């Protein structure tokens, strides 16, 4: 009987000790801090607190910038110019008539040009730009053809060849023009004020040397077109002062010959002005 009583007391003691400890409860993890990254900053919010701590990273990512350097020698193919041709007439028509180059009565008014119709078209096969100093100072050169069309206001003017003789005809044509085409090599010193920009601002100046490879007198009367091919005593070689102005995407060009365009008879200095269509 005593053994049974002692066993019951022992069992009750063990059961009460197990009842004091909850073995089914799961342990809760400790609260974590909130971390937010914005660019080069890290914002940390402490657990259970309204305070925020801002930490700046020491590492920065650089923006992707174009690092390509301009080439020291660049080539531009097939450049086109579109402008106007004219000339400064300082001819002595009395002397020209005496020499038999022009007919009596031919003067400055008879050889006056139509400003809006007298066109200049240049086609440059290529132009190159050579860097001299930091792409600000450059040398530009190339090769191409100059096409000059001198349209006369006087629709009765007539050009004869071998020998050259300019006279007043009786037929009134719809169009009368003298065309002079040159193979030309230009060379200019270029100043680029914005070398890192594609369409920047700059100016160029220099000289060009041209060779007259074709000339013709052309008339048009309705559907009838007549051409007389001859050099008409025009100078074979032409030296000109040339210039170019770059205003962003707009480019202007101009030229002024160094001397008279005729070998004899007349004294006319040609010049041109217009727009240039090129990459630089």
Task: Name each model feature, range by range.
Residues 87-120:
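Surface-exposed strand-loop-strand hairpins of Gram-negative outer-membrane beta-barrel proteins
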Residues 66-74, 89-91, 130-137, 194-200:
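Short loop/turn motifs that connect adjacent beta-strands in outer-membrane beta-barrel proteins
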Residues 74-78, 115-121, 179-183, 199, ...:
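Residues that define the transmembrane beta-barrel architecture of outer-membrane proteins
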Residues 230-280:
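Predominantly the C-terminal beta-signal and adjacent terminal strand-loop region
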Residues 84-88, 129, 145-151, 207-213, ...:
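Transmembrane beta-strands of outer-membrane beta-barrel pores
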Residues 69, 80, 123-129, 143-145, ...:
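Residues on the lipid-exposed face of transmembrane beta-strands in outer-membrane beta-barrel proteins
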Residues 1-67:
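Cleavable N-terminal export/targeting peptides
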Residues 131, 172-247:
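Outer-membrane beta-barrel transmembrane domain signature
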């Amino acid at each position: 009987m005593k053994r049974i009583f002692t066993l019951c007391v022992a069992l009750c003691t063990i059961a009460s000790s197990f009842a004091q400890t909850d073995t089914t409860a799961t342990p809760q993890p400790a609260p974590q801090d909130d971390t937010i990254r914005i660019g080069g900053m890290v914002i940390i919010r402490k657990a259970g607190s309204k305070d925020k701590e801002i930490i700046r990273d020491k590492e920065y990512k650089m923006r992707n910038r174009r690092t390509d350097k301009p080439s020291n020698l660049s080539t531009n193919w097939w450049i086109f110019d579109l402008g106007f041709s004219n000339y400064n007439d300082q001819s002595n028509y009395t002397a020209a008539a005496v020499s038999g180059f022009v007919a009596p009565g031919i003067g400055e008014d008879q050889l006056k040009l139509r400003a809006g119709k007298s066109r200049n078209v240049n086609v440059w096969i290529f132009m190159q730009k050579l860097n001299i100093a930091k792409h600000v100072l450059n040398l530009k050169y190339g090769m191409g053809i100059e096409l000059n069309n001198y349209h006369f206001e006087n629709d009765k003017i007539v050009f004869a060849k071998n020998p050259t003789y300019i006279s007043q005809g009786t037929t009134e044509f719809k169009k009368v023009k003298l065309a002079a085409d040159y193979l030309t090599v230009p060379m200019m010193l270029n100043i680029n004020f914005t070398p890192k920009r594609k369409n920047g601002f700059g100016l160029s100046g220099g000289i060009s040397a041209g060779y007259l490879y074709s000339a013709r007198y052309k008339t048009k009367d309705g559907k009838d077109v007549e051409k007389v091919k001859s050099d008409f005593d025009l100078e074979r070689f032409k030296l000109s002062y040339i210039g170019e102005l770059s205003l962003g995407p707009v480019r202007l060009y101009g030229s002024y010959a160094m001397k008279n365009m005729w070998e004899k008879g007349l004294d006319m200095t040609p010049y041109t002005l217009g727009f240039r269509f090129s990459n630089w």
